[in-house]
Amino acid sequence: MQESKEQRVHGVFEKIYKNYDQMNSVISFQQHKKWRDKTMQIMNVKEGAKALDVCCGTADWTIALAEAAGKSGEIKGLDFSKNMLSIGEKKVKEGGYSQIELLHGNAMELPFADDSFDFVTIGFGLRNVPDYLTVLKEMRRVVKPGGQVVCLETSQPEMFGFRQAYFLYFKYIMPFFGKMFAKSYKEYSWLQESAREFPGMKELARLFEEAGLTNVKYHSFTGGVAATHIGWK
């Protein structure tokens, strides 16, 4: 019986959780932190904000949201991998982030009421869900009117030559790094597949609009290897 995408992805993240943060830095050459910082600048999260970080993983973006919102903020992080959440819980406890609550759950069926959050984010997680549009619609449902839905994700470079080099890197070098640093060649081979199949910037912007979001904008990083998309409700 063939594994579903959801089962396969769950297995990947349950296995690579211990080395996930290190591998993010290796694979992106530390750029993922700069991309997130720039995205946070664009979002302009205010003191006391309520935010949800979907597919929060080890909670790096969740913590960034908490630092921006301050002690009066209310931040939720949700992920379907208990092992990834265990790393996040340790960070939250060590940092004393009392405004953060991490939850085990499914991005396809968010366990929150309509119009609950000022910001709903997803970082390097949308490409791994079974249905992109369903998750975007769920994110729109739980964000407040006037709130932002934000996705930071790998993208598809458009410049000839660089695009080909990018896909060669993802196909051959990234799995090699996975084997060398995390002993997880198979799992990182899957992650390059998910990145290759993920929509480009214009197509993802169209999906944001199809999900009912308005004034959709996107910002390209590092020649198009990643992008932030923001839409309003």
UniProtKB/Swiss-Prot annotation:
- Name the residues that bind S-adenosyl-L-methionine: T58, D79, N106, A107
Pathway field: Quinol/quinone metabolism; menaquinone biosynthesis; menaquinol from 1,4-dihydroxy-2-naphthoate: step 2/2
UniProt enzyme class: transferase
| Cleaved signal peptide residues | none
- PANTHER family xref list: 2-METHOXY-6-POLYPRENYL-1,4-BENZOQUINOL METHYLASE, MITOCHONDRIAL, METHYLTRANSFERASE
- Entry's family note: Belongs to the class I-like SAM-binding methyltransferase superfamily. MenG/UbiE family.
Question: What does the function comment of this entry state?
Answer: Methyltransferase required for the conversion of demethylmenaquinol (DMKH2) to menaquinol (MKH2).
Stated name of the protein = Demethylmenaquinone methyltransferase
Q: Which organism is it from?
A: Bacillus velezensis (strain DSM 23117 / BGSC 10A6 / LMG 26770 / FZB42) (Bacillus amyloliquefaciens subsp. plantarum)
